[in-house]
């Protein structure tokens, strides 16, 4: 979302579908937004995600210089902000941005649980 509130890109995880370990929604959304703006720096842009980003995605956000990150559910297993070593707090990083997490945590957690339960059910049918 840009500084005027316009949605620049939307995405979802295509890691399994495309057999691409980098096919996370955040990476795809950042890439598309940068293309639309014709600029890799997304300083005045905000990123909204359902689940706390993994270290790879948080690294991409730092590289893209995003303005603000908003996320719903925390991910204690793989979330880059919930891990014991939160590299985001490392003072050596060249960019920092506000992170607002836990937004509608219950709803986001429920949405993700339902989504993955359905995927497992469909996978077991095949």
Tell where the protein language model's regions lie, with residue ranges.
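Structural motif
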Residues: 6, 46, 68-69
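A short, polar/charged loop-to-alpha-helix boundary motif
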Residues: 14-28
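Helix-adjacent hinge/juxtasegments
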Residues: 27-62
